[in-house]
Amino acid sequence: MINIKDISKSSNQSEEKSLKGTSSKTKYPFAAKSLFKGSNNITPYYLSTSNTFQCVASESIQTWLLSDDGHIFTSSGNFVLDVSSGGYFVELVQLNSNSKTQIWTIDTTNNKIQNQGNGKYLDIDNLKICVAPLNGNATQKWTTFRRAPIPTGNWGYFQSKQLDSNNNYWGLSVLNNSKSYNTSVVMNKVQAKSIGQIWQMTNDGHILSRLDGNLVLDIGPSINGSKTNYYLDTNVYKANDLKQQWGINENNQIFNQYYPNLCIGFVGELGVDSTVNCVLAQPSSASDINFQWITNPTYSLNEIVSEVPEPFPAYTSGDLLASYQYISNIATNGHTDDIRSLYTSINVSLEIFYVNVTNATCPSSIHSTEDFSNVQNQIKNELTYAITVRLVFENYSGFYSKLFSQGSTNLTNLANLINVDMSSDQVVNGDYTDAITSVFYAIISEIPIGGSIIANIGESAVEFGELYAESNDSGPSTYQVTLSKLYDHLNENYENEMTNAQSMKNTILQDWGMMSKTFALCFLPTKNPSSLNINGLDFQKISTIASLAYQTAMIQMLLPTNYQIYFTPAGYYAPVSSDDYSYTDSTGTYIMAEIDNCNSYPPKALTDKLWNNGVSKQEVFTSSYGWNLATSVTYYNMVDKYSGMFKLSFPTVKNFTSVPMQFVMTNGSDRVGTFNVKTHFAGLASTYYYSGALGHHYYDIAVTDIDGNKVANFTVDNNLEALEGSYVSIKTGSLVVQPGYVVGNPTCNQGSFSQGFAASILIPIYKSN
């Protein structure tokens, strides 16, 4: 049995269309919203796979895939809608191609969804989905619309559609970029390098701030005691707190899950004051621009390529067909009588075709000059659109090629700086998608106005490749690669992304609707987040930013092979002589040094590539966001402070997901401790624990998300050796990973008794696709 949910996060939703495919493999994403308004006659409901009724922002549970033969799949493609054996309730089951009750007809004219097995119509019974004979009730009326695969989990801005008097965009901002909880969220002019303006929407509807791992958007205090008007602030991420969960509706309003009729807006006039208060209130109307938002980037191409195909005007007979074939021959100098087949060809000049079409005159063999003129004008329009679309992708390909043109040389130079043997079989965590996503993040954070154009194309190409891949499963091989194969791995993925971009371009060029919509985006003002207008873009600046970001991503992959972090708790001596390789906060001092020698530090030429290019020290030394250095606990000159503790392994769990985690560490029946792990941060098991005798000691670790759902279980094997410190690893056969997650290659570093530092192990956990 499945249920319906309140309105959820959606992308910019297009007008309703007849949802029909063209091949047995084609599946188009769509959403179905009930015209039934519920008990309050306000809240809209969506067809959903979830078994609760609260509104959520997870697009995946309310996105369906319609095949051309009438099957309605879940967004993962694993299950289809079917009528239960009782013939009343609707359920999710495995595909059975012989079952007619799994086939549905969507009637967009009459707003009905009919089951072909029993002829009944999709209906609602106490918020449960069922089928019933046609009855005329609103519960049987559904409006369907295209839903683009806009990804959650990427960083960007939430910008108001309302511009100030100088046509500047303003966006949601944490006041003064403060990491403190209960800080006001306000409106500020969108500007570069303002991390407090950058957010990420998670699958469950939390809106994370880039300022800190567990910092999320929350409802603030009431305005003058009102129950319908609130300020906004930040708070710590809480599980199942609907006041912290949000969605985006078809009016581009950001609504709250606890108060689904209240949306985020602002009071005041943008541009008059440097800061304008954000509020949670009820919009005056669906078109109240003070309550409408644009995400930046918008991933505008995602929506376009997920549209139902709209073919070119068909010319199948008479003078229309004759005109099309004649014009095609004239344009291509006799190469073909089907000019549209060449729109995707890289070996032809569409500009020359356009000139030839323009100069063509109607031959005497074609009697209708009107038909000839109509075809001629249509082909001229198509060529104009195709030329523009191709130019956009050619510029993107040029940018992308330049980014990777020195890939081998750059990787070699970095390896030499880090003192890494690139011919070795040492395994590193090298996820290409994370690397390229970090490049797009760097571009939009440095150039928020205009930089989104590159991200709109690039991120859409990434999503396009994943959407149309034969499998969406992401296994350990995605993240694990030997140093000797790292360049080949990166180069192969680079070529795949180039192919994805080309495939997306060709998909657009073969569809009149997609080509028309893409052409329109090419003439939006560059500052518009949906724009593909490359005129005036500073490609040199963009390329420089991208190159530095990609270099940083390579350092993130290579650094853990030779360096780790040595952490000395506050109050104890730490031999710091340079800020180049150290960082201190209230918890203690972090020093970056070689794995085998805590007194051998990275060269200045390497640290300059980090600190001189704006890399955050706090993120590097605490293994936050893209950094994943194992951490060892160290007490200099105090080896006997805690008997045997330096022979311990100190596990670090790195959370690469947007959901907080925790892990429990036990030793037999002894519970060592529970350790929290922020989103995109690392959690260090820092409890002091007596190691015991020499030999193998096993520490069981159970990782769960903030809701208590299992993520992974494994056992750390800590092998104590006399005078040698300890050797640490994941016990063979102990790793169990839940569906939806991937555990990357653990970084295992030996401890040293003589130098007074513990063994370290970092276990990275990723969300799989």
Curated annotation (Swiss-Prot):
It is found in: Cytoplasm; Membrane. Induction: Induced by high levels of extracellular Ca(2+). GO terms for biological process: response to cation stress. Its main location: cytoplasm. GO terms for molecular function: carbohydrate binding. Residues 1-21 are annotated as: Disordered. Keywords: Cytoplasm, Lectin, Membrane, Repeat. It is a peripheral membrane protein. Residues 25-145, 116-249 form the Ricin B-type lectin domain. It comes from the Eukaryota. PROSITE patterns: RICIN_B_LECTIN. One of its GO terms (cellular component) is nucleus. SUPFAM superfamilies: Ricin B-like lectins. Belongs to the cup family. May play an important role in stabilizing and/or regulating the cell membrane during Ca(2+) stress or certain stages of development. This is Calcium up-regulated protein F. It comes from Dictyostelium discoideum. The lineage of its organism: Eukaryota, Amoebozoa, Evosea, Eumycetozoa, Dictyostelia. The gene is cupF.
